[in-house]
Amino acid sequence: MEFYSIIKDRRILLGLTQQDLADYSGLSLRIIKSIEAGKGNPSVGTLTKIADILGLEIIMKVKEVNK
């Protein structure tokens, strides 16, 4: 599942509108819509703001390399 689908699904589960998420995060509605549509390239900072509001955690892990 792509990160933008997770954001949208979680927002809906919490009963928030895109405008609510924009207001709480300090981001524009245009940015929220763009992220949820899978467009653009949001920064880690932007994703962190959204994740905090939605109760999500961003985890980075080392990719396994087949030898």
PLM regions and their residue ranges:
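Small-residue (primarily alanine) positions within well-ordered alpha-helices
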Residues: 22-25, 51
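Absolute protein N-terminus
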Residues: 1-3
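Short basic helix-loop element that most often maps to the first helix and adjoining turn
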Residues: 5-23
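Short acidic DE-rich linear segments
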Residues: 64-67
